[in-house]
């Protein structure tokens, strides 16, 4: 999960010439790209930095590239002064992904490492899921572009849609890279990703609602261009009587804030509870208890006669995304749903991830 921090890393890919293309990538290029992506995750998305170690080794490079791409897209609102520039940068990333899938990755660390992951996938299993992977990445980019302005969500349903199209989509992409095409595992990923996306919005409140610090660029520090923002759904804010300006001025003392946060956090927790119950039922040989709402959409097409237990074991490392979100929601509850008072996970998070993997429990 993206940990909201205003670390102003430059968008390296955007500063590179778009005309720079080559089809041959050396081992040194891949190693340099891997170091870059891992450093980004360690500094700015520690949850993903930990989980990467537990996803199946054949997709660890792809996972690192995907999560670093997500970081770059999340950072864009901090670095652009108007929507037009933001759209140009999003277009750059889409073109870079298109070229990477065409075998012409630009000299950009994320694309180089993703290209390596795609080559490894082709060597393992051909191109059976390559189309799906490209679809999911493109959906991530389009969704990030749509939400670049940091406007509040209209309601909880629109927040869930955002979470499905970002964090669930990242999980679908990783699963397709194994490759694993499983309705039940995708169904679990959908609920977990929704919980992750909602929890990320809550985690971002103390950062986005505060005046932004300067952004680091290759030329030095520059003033951040964004205004303070509060992304809580408007219906939850209205029900709790929360006003944006009061949150910007008063922070945790803003009237109704904790009530609104409680309502949103409850929805995230509901998705985790649903995923846990589903996992228990599936491991017991039962049906999941409810239908997958996205079955038949986009790339959600599956074959009959699959081995559910084998698929769960194969994809369980990806489902570990649930653990950081679950721990955050627990700490949020301990702080009486004051997002400004949530403590860090510390040493408990890596231990909890390892335990979850060992026991196959989320």
Model-derived features: positions:
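Short, surface-exposed polybasic-aromatic patches that bind anionic ligands, especially phosphate groups
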Residues: 15
